[in-house]
Amino acid sequence: MTVKFNVEVPCEDLKAPELGHGGYEGLRPRNETLLKGSVTAPGRRVLSCDILVEHDVPITMRDGCKLYADIYRPTNAPERSVPAILCWSPFGKKFNGIDSLKLMTPWNLGIPEGTLSGLEKFEAPDPAEWVDRGYAIINVDSRGAFDSEGVMAIMGTQEAEDGYDTIEWLAKLPWCNGSVGMAGNSHLAIIMWFVAALQPPSLKAIAPWEGCGDLYREQFARGGIYGGDLFDHLIIKYMLRGRNGMESFKKMFQQHPLANEWWNDKRPDMKKINIPTYITGTYTNTMHGMGAIRGWLEVNSPDKWLRWHPYQEWYDLWGNQEGRAELLNFFDRYLKGIENDWESTPRVRMSVLRYGEKEPIANVVEEDFPLPRTNYRKAYLTADGALSLDQPAPTSGSVSYNSEDSRDLATFTYKFTERTQIVGMPKAVLYMRNDDFDD
């Protein structure tokens, strides 16, 4: 690794890649053409065009480390004509959306059979859709993932430099038109903040759909409590595979629970991002919401959009046809230079969840975010478990819960007397004192 810190970075082992796990086929560099009208398996999306697939393409980083990618692109396209969409993550470039939905969600998230081809990487766009529109999809196994060399470093400067090197390598390939974008959600969105902040010359646009903006404060140490259960018990256990181990968030928190140089390296400087950016966020995911908001507030480009939607993130990526069409139009504008009136897309759209109603209110066009017309109200916690708009007189009382029982809660209730919309960034100011300890 080329990136060094003033603190020792603890590592942990990963399970080695296993044939068949997460679609892993072993390291088998080869080219093949998938034919129009074919399917990768029964019930999957029918390919609408021929697709050239380059498997296990090596990409050498600035420190000599070699990463591997699968490239899906149009057959017989003229030289220098195809823009590239980079999809970056450690989950396995052949671990597809169909298998991931079966592993982690009920009822396929409501995404109809035949929507996905099985070529799509987990949390990434489907090559079956994008190649037919004249794009190449590049699915990379990041540093340390599967057969890619090195120690896995999740986010931070090391991964950002790897992304930079990959983008500039892609832009020089004979089929590429020199324009590279990044797409995907969750992990694939988070890494975009880091890579784009380094300003690779050939990175022309990004679409971070649901991307956390600070791994320490928004994920692993939120509220000062270790929050890595999802990462430790699902992602590491079932999804990550590699041969050289990975940086350990859990061990780092045990050794350094307060922010240090390494933790701060997991927070991208979004103010250095200066390219067109299409951001999404949602109420359904508490991990990524603040990253989407901070991205909207801090990205230093006049060409930025925020769509706050009411769906689960993977449904929005794969099942929301309107959203997919918008994403194609966004990249048509900034990777192909097509004058398609994308700029008339509303800069800010919000959604409102309606209690007791099946359908949310979506795509509410707003001037800005936070909403300029917001009426900010203070609500006070009371000793009898209420939220009061009037500051209560000082009194003593208690509301308690069992912190060892995940089902137990301390609740404070406010009853609305008129129809009200809550859109924005609520915050709590809490005054604390511990009489038994010197804290």
What is each stretch, according to the model?
Residues 2-87, 93, 387-400, 404-408:
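Catalytic-loop region of hydrolases
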